[in-house]
Amino acid sequence: RKPRARTNENIVNEIKFWIHKLGVNEFIFRDPVFSIDRKKTLELAELIIKEELDIRFTIETHLNNLDYELSSKLKEAGMFFIQCGVESVDQDVLNDAKRFSLKKADEVEKIEMLRGLGVKVMGMYILGYESDTRESCLATIEYAKKLNTNIAVFSVFTPYPGTPIFVSFKDRITATKFEEYNQWNPVFKHDNLSKDDIRSLLTFAFDSYYLNIKWFFKNFIQQLI
């Protein structure tokens, strides 16, 4: 089924509704590839600026769909936060999972660009891909610390029922209840990692990231100086 895109005018009219009716001035665009249509996204930013809408907003997108012109225009329109999927540092793991990724040097450059514009960044990472090992997961955690985004979120690779990828994992699924599909609980028998291994890596990822002095200094101490 072909997706149906809303017009920029329709989006701006809804923003105006929330501003005038309820005094809302902060928004999240719940579209995982918000800027995939560069021209349309640029025109939306320009329309928000033209209408003088005093708002702040968050987007989610792939770093590949951002450049300086578009990012700076979105920032001018009110973008202050971006969620982007980094997923893994291991290109072989991403290839096996059929996940597209930028070259790591380009990824670093895009995040530095956003940081330079004053946009806060959330990096999203996945542990426990089918070909992941303990070593590849630890490398991803270290890479996340190197990128040092404002927020990092780590989750377990989860093939959800009803998705195409679920079919290839169907014979290995161990989850018996839908509530187990929560991106924290491993739901299939992994060849390289036990369920306890994956849970331990996930806990270590959060502890290692948020107790890291580099992150703590950037996000807390510098704001007090």
Where are these regions (language model features)?
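Radical SAM [4Fe-4S] cluster-binding motif and immediate context
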Residues: 1-122, 129, 142
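Generic detection of long, well-ordered alpha-helical segments
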Residues: 8, 38, 134, 194-199
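Short, solvent-exposed beta-strand edge segments and adjacent coil->beta transition regions
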Residues: 31, 124, 183-185
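A short glycine-rich, hydrophobically flanked beta-strand micro-motif that places a catalytic Asp/Glu
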Residues: 124-125, 154
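Active-site glycine- and acidic-residue-rich loops that bind
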Residues: 131-137
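C-terminal accessory regions of radical SAM enzymes
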Residues: 138, 142-154, 158-225
